[in-house]
C-alpha cells in the first residue's frame, strides 16, 4: 500500500520501494526533510502499479529483494514503459555483489548504493542524478 505524500515539492517527486519498514521510514524522513515529495511502497507489484499509472516520478529508489517482484524486475519493466524509460533509478540494497551491480546497470539503473548507506552521500548522489537529467 502506498503512503502518499501530502504536498507538491519544488525539488521533485521520489518513489521509495523497500520491504523493510524501518528503511522506508528513514528514507521518507530523509527525503521529505530535503524537500522532496515521497511515495513509499513495500513490494514490487505496488511499485509497478504506481510506475505504470499516470503519476510521474523524478527518481525511483528500489531495493532488490522485495516480495512479489524484485527491484531488478521492477527496473526491467520500468525500462519497457514508453512514458517511463528515462526515469532515473537508484538501486539501494544490502546485496553488494558485483553480479548484482552489473545486472542493475545492464537493466538501466543510474546508480547502485549498498546498505548501510550514508544519508548525506545518498542525498548528494540523488541531487547529482537529478541535476544531470
Q: Which sequence ranges carry the predicted segments?
A:
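The feature encodes the CheY-like receiver
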Residues: 24, 66-68, 85, 97, ...
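Non-catalytic signal-transmission and effector/linker regions of two-component phosphorelay proteins
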Residues: 1-15, 120-133
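Acidic, metal-coordinating helix/loop segments flanking the phosphotransfer/catalytic sites
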Residues: 40-59
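Hydrophobic/aromatic residues positioned on beta-strands within the core alpha/beta folds
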Residues: 90-92
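Charged docking surfaces used in two-component/phosphorelay signaling
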Residues: 25-33
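His-Asp phosphorelay/catalytic-motif detector in bacterial-type signaling
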Residues: 56-58, 82-88
Amino acid at each position: 500500500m502506498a503512503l502518499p505524500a501530502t504536498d507538491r515539492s519544488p525539488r521533485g517527486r521520489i518513489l521509495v520501494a523497500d520491504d523493510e519498514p524501518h528503511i522506508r521510514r528513514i528514507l521518507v524522513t530523509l527525503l521529505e526533510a530535503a524537500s522532496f515529495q515521497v511515495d513509499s511502497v513495500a513490494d514490487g507489484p505496488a511499485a509497478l502499479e504506481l510506475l505504470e499509472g499516470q503519476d510521474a516520478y523524478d527518481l525511483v529508489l528500489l531495493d532488490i529483494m522485495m516480495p512479489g517482484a524484485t527491484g531488478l524486475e521492477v527496473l526491467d519493466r520500468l525500462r519497457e514503459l514508453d512514458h517511463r524509460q528515462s526515469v532515473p533509478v537508484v538501486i539501494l540494497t544490502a546485496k553488494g555483489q558485483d553480479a548484482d551491480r552489473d545486472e542493475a546497470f545492464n537493466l538501466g539503473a543510474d546508480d547502485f548504493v549498498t546498505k548501510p548507506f550514508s544519508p548525506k552521500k545518498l542525498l548528494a548522489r540523488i541531487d547529482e542524478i537529478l541535476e544531470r537529467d
